[in-house]
């Protein structure tokens, strides 16, 4: 959620940075409503001042011996009653304008950071670095992960359609074991890196989704329970960040670092026809998430370390990847700055996103009202929030099934996963 004060005091800069996203965002209605709000506040202040003045005059006159029912005092009392009536009429007007302003601000995305590249769409994203070129497989006949998975009997898409619908999968035997091994491996690595594990609810309320920015704009992307005001979590970012909603932390508590495994649920309403096969785009998938609640002064540094934590997982698995910095036109709604990690999928001869590491600055904190207090100082400030996939489990499995695929149709198990799977080969 953007700061109304920032919109009011720097309207041209705010509009310019919103325009760099490429959408249609207009702050003029907010400024107009704010002017009306200020006018009502001024009117209320004036009426309250006059009301206080009348009260003092009546008190003074009665104290000096005037009859409480004298014409002069009755005139003052009548005026006082009229003021009370006007103030009562102002209250709903002020509430309505405040609600309208809040709603319009809720509909605005975050401002791209000063260092985010300006661009229209993903074609103008900036490649930062690559890693693991030497690990790219040389086998020219690599099967797509869904084909090798079905041949090995570890991925079953057909029966998943029977049970649910398309974009679901059954993980069978070593497929289920590999999924579980990846989850445990990632959590173990993040815990060693200083994250505290959380296992949160995956049914979440609307306030939680508003807090992290999924509502109101992306309601159609989420699954909602029919009879309850609850939603299936699209990512662990939502429940974990909202652990601290409406709380005031001490600066000594920061940074707070959590990792969490959850199933994630997404309708993928805008992706019809994309990635219709395989594990890349499912309605239900598992993910390990990293979430940070940090001091604003440490925000940029914590973002870089978050990316490094995600990269460390890919490096340990020896999966080739590249780091992409998203341009302003490709940023997610809540992000001020974002790096995507893209893993190499040899069957498609391309890199595909496996982690998105975002710095939201105070955008989510304002929506979720997460603040902190500096020791010895008055008042509070909003924290900065960050999150990153560490990693998406299904996409990691897809990358392993392709990059570790052998000419004989087996798949080697990455060395770091062998203690979890108790085997060296999937066959």
Swiss-Prot record:
Keywords: Aminoacyl-tRNA synthetase, ATP-binding, Cytoplasm, Ligase, Nucleotide-binding, Protein biosynthesis. One of its GO terms (molecular function) is serine-tRNA ligase activity. Its EC number is 6.1.1.11. Residues 1-20 have a biased composition (Basic and acidic residues). Residues 1-21 are annotated as: Disordered. InterPro entries: aa-tRNA-synt_IIb, aa-tRNA-synth_II, aa-tRNA-synth_II/BPL/LPL, Ser-tRNA-ligase_type_1, Ser-tRNA-synth_1_N, SerRS_1_N_sf, SerRS_core, tRNA-bd_arm. GO terms for cellular component: cytoplasm. ATP binds at residues 266-268, 353-356. It is found in: Cytoplasm. GO terms for biological process: selenocysteine biosynthetic process; seryl-tRNA aminoacylation. Pathway: Aminoacyl-tRNA biosynthesis; selenocysteinyl-tRNA(Sec) biosynthesis; L-seryl-tRNA(Sec) from L-serine and tRNA(Sec): step 1/1. It holds the Pfam family tRNA-synt_2b. The keyword Ribosomal protein does not apply. Its main location: cytoplasm. It is an enzyme of class 6 (ligase). It catalyses: tRNA(Ser) + L-serine + ATP = L-seryl-tRNA(Ser) + AMP + diphosphate + H(+); tRNA(Sec) + L-serine + ATP = L-seryl-tRNA(Sec) + AMP + diphosphate + H(+). L-serine binds at residues 235-237, 289, 389. Homodimer. The tRNA molecule binds across the dimer. Consists of two distinct domains, a catalytic core and a N-terminal extension that is involved in tRNA binding. Catalyzes the attachment of serine to tRNA(Ser). Is also able to aminoacylate tRNA(Sec) with serine, to form the misacylated tRNA L-seryl-tRNA(Sec), which will be further converted into selenocysteinyl-tRNA(Sec). Belongs to the class-II aminoacyl-tRNA synthetase family. Type-1 seryl-tRNA synthetase subfamily. This is Serine--tRNA ligase. It comes from Microcystis aeruginosa (strain NIES-843 / IAM M-2473). The lineage of its organism: Bacteria, Bacillati, Cyanobacteriota, Cyanophyceae, Oscillatoriophycideae.
């Amino acid at each position: 959620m953007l700061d109304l004060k920032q919109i009011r005091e720097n309207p041209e800069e705010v509009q310019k940075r919103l325009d760099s996203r490429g959408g249609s965002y207009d702050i003029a209605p907010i400024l107009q409503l704010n002017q009306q709000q200020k006018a009502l506040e001024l009117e209320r202040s004036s009426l309250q001042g006059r009301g206080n003045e009348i009260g003092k005059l009546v008190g003074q006159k009665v104290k000096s011996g005037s009859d409480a029912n004298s014409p002069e005092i009755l005139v003052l009392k009548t005026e006082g009653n009229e003021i009370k009536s006007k103030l009562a009429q102002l209250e709903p007007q002020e509430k309505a304008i405040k609600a309208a302003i809040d709603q319009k601000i809720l509909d605005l995305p975050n401002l791209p950071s000063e260092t985010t590249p300006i661009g229209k769409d993903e074609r103008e994203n900036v490649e930062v670095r690559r890693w693991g070129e030497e690990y790219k497989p040389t086998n020219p006949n690599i099967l797509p992960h869904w084909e090798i998975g079905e041949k090995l009997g570890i991925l079953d898409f057909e029966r998943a359609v029977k049970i649910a619908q398309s974009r679901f999968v059954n993980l069978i035997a070593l497929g289920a074991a590999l999924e579980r091994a990846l989850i445990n491996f990632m959590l173990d690595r993040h815990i060693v890196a200083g994250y505290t594990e959380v296992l949160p609810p995956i049914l979440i309320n609307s306030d939680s989704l508003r807090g992290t920015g999924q509502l109101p704009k992306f309601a159609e992307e989420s699954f909602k329970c029919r009879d309850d005001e609850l939603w299936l979590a699209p990512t662990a970012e939502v429940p974990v960040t909202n652990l601290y909603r409406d709380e005031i932390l001490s600066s000594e508590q920061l940074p707070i670092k959590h990792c969490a495994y959850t199933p994630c649920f997404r309708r993928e309403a805008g992706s019809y026809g994309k990635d219709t096969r395989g594990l890349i785009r499912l309605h239900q998938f598992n993910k390990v998430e990293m979430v940070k609640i940090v001091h604003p002064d440490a925000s940029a540094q914590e973002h870089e370390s978050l990316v490094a934590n995600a990269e460390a997982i890919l490096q340990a698995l020896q999966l080739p990847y590249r780091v992409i910095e998203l341009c302003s036109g490709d940023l997610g709604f809540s992000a001020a700055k974002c790096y995507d990690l893209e893993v190499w999928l040899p069957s498609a001869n391309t890199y595909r996103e496996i982690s998105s590491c975002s710095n939201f600055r105070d955008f989510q904190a304002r929506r979720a009202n997460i603040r902190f207090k500096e020791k010895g100082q008055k008042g509070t400030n909003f924290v900065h929030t960050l999150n990153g996939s560490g990693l998406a489990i299904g996409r990691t499995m897809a990358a392993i099934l392709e990059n570790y695929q052998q000419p004989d149709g087996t798949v080697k198990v990455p060395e770091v996963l062998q203690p979890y799977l108790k085997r060296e080969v999937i066959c």
